[in-house]
Amino acid sequence: MPPHLVQFLLGGQTCVVATVDEHRWPTTTLMTWVVARNPQTVTLAVDTRGKSLRNIRKNAHVAIEVLGDDLCYGLRGVAVIEKEEMQSPPFPCALVAVRIEDVRDHGAAGVKFVGPTYSYETGKEHRAGFEKVVFAELKGPPPTI
């Protein structure tokens, strides 16, 4: 991934992730916890109760659409379930690492893209605290080298 895309994903972002179901149909879902671990790896917190994790178990090929201010990238790669049960999310999630094999800039010359954002309803601000610890777990421990 180019450096500016890695930098964008280092802090954690929301992305659209596509998996392949048992009938070989693409299935998309919005994943709120996506982090770049390094230029070749993106990690995801994937709900263990949903279809995406079942799909990844059967077919590890995934696509990720990254949308942000002046960013529009398509990533393709192979997913590996690194941890069946993450400790930090408020609901059951697996930690999935994706080895990025293809990066495509989907931006268009002369077009300014303003990325998606979200906010919390009144009384739900505590969810921002969950995000902080989930993103930290997805980043993993600091390198030992």
Annotate each PLM feature.
Residues 1-145:
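Binding-site signature for planar aromatic cofactors or substrates
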